[in-house]
Amino acid sequence: MTSPENPDLPDADDAYVDSGPGTQPASLEDLDMDSASTMRPMATQAVYRPEFDDTDGTSRGTVVTEAYDQVTMATRALSPMRRLGGGLVEIPRVPERDPLTALMTNPVVAESKRFCWNCGKPVGRSTPDGRALSEGWCPHCGSPYSFLPQLSPGDIVADQYEIKGCIAHGGLGWVYLAFDKNVNDRPVVLKGLVHSGDAEAQAIAMAERQFLAEVTHPGIVKIYNFVEHEDKHGNPVGYIVMEYVGGTSLKQARGAKLPVAEAIGYMLEILPALGYLHSIGLAYNDLKPENIMITEEQLKLIDLGAVSRLNSYGYLYGTPGYQAPEIVRTGPTVATDIYTVGRTLAALTLSLRTRRGRYVDGLPSDDPVLETYDSYHRLLRRAIDPDPRRRFTSAEEMSSQLLGVLREVVATDTGVPRPGLSTVFSPSRSTFGVDLLVAHTDVYVDGQVHSEKLTAQEIVRALPVPLVDRTDVGAPMLVASVLSEPVHTLDQLRAARHGALDTEGIDLNESVELPLMEVRALLDLGDVAKATRKLEDLAARVGWRWRLVWFKAVSEMLSADYDSATKHFTEVLDTLPGELAPKLALAATAELAGTADELKFYKTVWSTDNGVISAGFGLARAQSVAGERDMAVQTLDEVPPTSRHFTTARLTSAVTLLSGRSTSEITEQHIRDAARRVEALPDSEPRVLQIRALVLGTALDWLADNTASSNHILGFPFTEHGLKLGVEASLRALARIAPTQSHRYALVDLANSVRPMSTF
C-alpha cells in the first residue's frame, strides 16, 4: 500500500486500471510518437476514429468461437499449485485476498501522473510560485480537472453501495471499493464511465455502456449495474459497478520477465474470453498485463472501460505500445485485438525498447528469448504483423498455434517430449529415412550395394497432409478420402465431378478442398506437372492460401527445386508456427539439398514429439554428418520401445558406433557397446545376423592394431581366434538365408577365408 510519505501509486493497486495517467481523448495526429499524449508513461488513452468508409479490403467482422462452460466444483482443499495451458505449465496458486487490504491509505495522484483529461497536457504541477493544485482548470484548454476522490468512505451510492475507499486511479479517475448493502455486503468495484466535467458526455456514456451488462463469461469481470451519483457540484456522474476480483494482476506478478511457458499459459486462459467478446460483436481493445487478474482459481479480464463494438468509430480507448497502429482507420476488429495479445506476450517475456514512456513497435532483434524459441518468435511476428490481414484470423486460431508453441517450449525447457494432436494437419502417414543407415549392411544378405540416399518421393508419401477445411462445401464427401489410396481418391473426385455421387444440391464448383485433394493425389502418384497446373488454376481463383502453398512446396520438392520448396514451407511455418509438419518438411528438404538447417528442425520435432520417428532418425543422421556420433546414438536410444521401429533404432545405433570411423578412432568401449545392443535382440529379428557380422568383423580388424580384454562379445572371446570363429559363424548363418546360389557360395568362401587355422 502507499504510505503518506510516498504518494506515488503502487503497482499493487493497479488491478482494475493502468497506474499511469488518465484516459485521454486524442486526435488523429496524436498517433504520432512525438505528440504530447504519447510522451507520457504508458496508460490507456483514446484515439478518435471518424465515421468514414474504409475500402482498402482489410478484413473485419466477428469471429464466432465457443464460450467456455462454467464448471462448479465441490469444496475441497486446494493444492498450492495450479496448472495452465492444458496442464503443461504449473504456477503458484494466488491466495484469496481480503478486499479491505486493497484500500489505499493515502489516495493521492503523484504530480508526474497528472494530465488534462481533454488535451493530454500536464496539469496540477508544482511551480516556482506555489504548490501543486489537485483540482482546477487546465491552463492549456480550460477544462476542469480534479485528482481528488469524488466519493468518500461511508458515502452511499444509489441507495445500495457503501463506499469503503479508493483502490486505484486510472484513466477515468478513481476506482472505489464498495460493499453492496442489498447483497450481503458483497464487495464490488465502482469506476467512472467518463470524466465528470461534461454532463452531456456522462449521459451518452451511460446509454452506450449498457451493452456491457450482456457480457457473461467466466474469464471476464462481471458487470452488476450502472448507477449515477451527484458530485459536489450537483452534476450526475455515471459509474459502472463491477465484480471485485481479488488477486494479483499480471503486471504485479511478473516483476522481472516471465518464463515464456508461463506467459503462454496465461494467454491461453485469456484468449477464450477474447474469442467470446468477438463472437458477440465486441472488441476488448486494451489488453495488457495490468488488465489481467490472476485469482485463486482462474484468470480474468478486468477493466471493461475500453470495450467497444467491432468496427465502431468515435473515441477508441487503448494503450500506446499495445494498441494496433491501424485502429483509427479500421476501427476495432478481431485483428486489432490479436495485435494486443502479441504485444502483451512480448511485454511479459522480452526486453522491449521504450521511447518517451511507451513501448516501441516491433520486436528486439537481439533478444536471447527469441533466439532460443524460434517458433515463439514466429508466432509473435504473425500476431503483430503490420498488415492486419496477415495476423491470426481469430482468437481460436491463435490459441491453437499458441498451444503448439507451448508444447515446444516446455519440451525444450524440461527435456521431456510433449506431443499433441494438430487441428490442421494429419499425423505422419508413414516414415522416411528409417532404414538408411542400416541399408548398406544388406550387402551381407544379397550381395547388392544399397543406396543410402533419401528421396523426395519417400518423404512426400510420409509427410503429414493438411486436414480438410470443415467449412468447405465439399468437406463432407472428403472425410473418408483423407487416408485413401491416390487412385481411389481420384476415382471418387471424378465421380463427384460428373454428378455420380449425391451432393444434396451443393454446388461443388465452389469447393477449394475438392481440387486440392486432387492435387494431393496427383503428387502422391508423382504427376507433378498436372498437379502444378491444377494448383495454379485454383490459386488464380481463390488466392495462395496456406494449404495451397503447402502443396506448391511439395511439388517443388518433387521437382528438386529445393530453394523454392524451402521458401514456401517456411511461409507455411510462419503462418502456423505451432505446427510440427512444416518443420519436418523443412528438415527433410534441407537434407535433400545438403544444407545444414535440417539438424535444428529435426531436433525441434523430435524433442517435442518422439512419436515422429522420421524426425528421430533424421536427427541422428544429421548429428552423424556433423561428427556428433555419440549424440546420434543417444538420439536413437530415445526411440520408445513401443515403436515398431525400436529394433531398427537399436541396430542403427550399433552401426553408428562403428561405421564412418577409422580403426584408430574406434575404442573397445564402442565395440562392446555395439555388441550389447545387438545381443539384446533375438536372432529372428531382420538384419540382426548381418549387424552381428559387422560388429564381429569390425572387432577383428580393430584387434589387429590394438589390445583388449578377453571378455566375450556376442558369445565369443575377444581374441583373434574367438572373433574369427564368430565372424565365420555369422557368415555361414547368412549363407543359409541367401536369396541366390551365387551369393550363398560367396558367403561360404568368405567364411572359409576367415576361419581360424585348425591345430591337431
Swiss-Prot record:
Q: Where is this region: Disordered?
A: 1-31
- GO biological process per UniProt: regulation of metabolic process
* Catalysed transformations (reactions): L-seryl-[protein] + ATP = O-phospho-L-seryl-[protein] + ADP + H(+); L-threonyl-[protein] + ATP = O-phospho-L-threonyl-[protein] + ADP + H(+)
* Domain of life of the native organism: Bacteria
A GO term, aspect molecular function: protein serine kinase activity
Question: Which parts of the sequence bind ATP?
Answer: I167, A168, H169, G170, G171, L172, G173, W174, V175, K191
Entry coiled-coil feature ranges: none
The cross-references to SMART domains, in alphabetical order and at most eight, read: S_TKc
Could you tell me which residue ranges the Protein kinase domain spans?
161-403
- EC number, as in UniProt: 2.7.11.1
Which terms are listed as keywords in the entry? ATP-binding, Kinase, Nucleotide-binding, Serine/threonine-protein kinase, Transferase
List, from the UniProt record, the residues annotated as the active site of this protein: D286 (proton acceptor)
Q: How does it assemble?
A: Interacts with GarA in vitro.
UniProt lists the family membership as follows: Belongs to the protein kinase superfamily. Ser/Thr protein kinase family.
Fill in the misc note. When artificially expressed from expression vectors, encodes an active kinase, which is able to block the lysosomal delivery of mycobacteria inside macrophages. However, while PknG transcripts are found in M.smegmatis, expression of PknG is blocked on a translational level in this non-pathogenic species. This lack of efficient translation is caused by regulatory elements in the upstream region of the gene.
Name of the protein this chain belongs to: Serine/threonine-protein kinase PknG
